[in-house]
Amino acid sequence: MRNSLIIALVFLLSMTCHAQKISMLDLVGKTWVADSGYDGCGNIDWNIVFSAKSSEHKFVGKSDNKVNVFTYNTYLCSYSPEKYEASLLGNTYGKYIVFERKYTYKGKEYEDFFCGEILSLESNRLTIRMKHSTILFIAK
């Protein structure tokens, strides 16, 4: 019985450690530069600057220096949502980061979202697991 209680206590403590919540304030005020793990990292530089409710994503072609800048509505969430939830815009705590994309490409308007799990955040390192990759960002 005593061993069962100890195992249960260890399990609960480990769950608490894994339930790390990130604050949007930890992301704001820095330029996060994608270092590795994303599609096109050999061809494109990717930087993100966060504000309380949005994020600016800057993509620069390494061969032609072509710049594309997109601003996405952004919020943090405690769970991985199935769709973008506008009512959560402004939510500043959570383990998942959600981006709403609205953009025009070749004259046609598009809208979708993507979500990533924040695996770790240190003062100058951010690791996000996206659908098909794990991306490391370095703060500059």
Task: Describe the function of each predicted region.
Residues 15-22, 137:
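Bacterial Sec-dependent signal peptides at the C-terminal "C-region" and cleavage site
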Residues 4-15:
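Sec-dependent N-terminal signal peptides
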Residues 116-139:
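Short, exposed beta-strand-loop hairpins at the edges of beta-sheets
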Residues 45-52, 70-73, 137:
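Broad, structure-driven detector of short, well-ordered beta-strand segments within folded domains
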Residues 19-33:
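N-terminal helix-cap/turn-to-beta initiation motif at the start of protein domains
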Residues 37-41, 58-123:
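Contiguous, well-ordered beta-strand patches that form the walls/edges
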Residues 1-4, 20:
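Positively charged n-region of N-terminal signal peptides that target proteins for export
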Residues 29-59:
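Start-of-domain marker
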